[in-house]
């Protein structure tokens, strides 16, 4: 069994480090077919890699086709974010699974967890004005020094809260 707490959508183009990208939960621009493909692929990866615990999968979508960027069988900086916005205690569940418990015995189903009734936007924080001489061009190397979270009933308001919080 596997549980996907939620799917986040990166706003910036592919190639920008995910830590430097604005991310939104739930994803705003994916079709149901694309979501179904991601859930299917993620389940296959988890089974084939014999994952017990956490796995982070990053996808890119172009013209309706889903591409795998990377599969990381470990925790990442997205774990506290997605745990917070979905209410799914990922670290606790992962540890309990590693100790032999089943997701279903802990009250969780398998597959994609239902979306929360709000939108959450993670906005990176940059300290370029304090770090002189730092390359400010976005790319695969992370430049942000923190992040904030905006939560609201819709994307516009959640993004606005995040941008205000990021300064």
Regions found by a protein language model. Name each.
Residues 1-167:
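ATP-dependent carboxylate activation and anion-phosphoryl transfer catalytic cores
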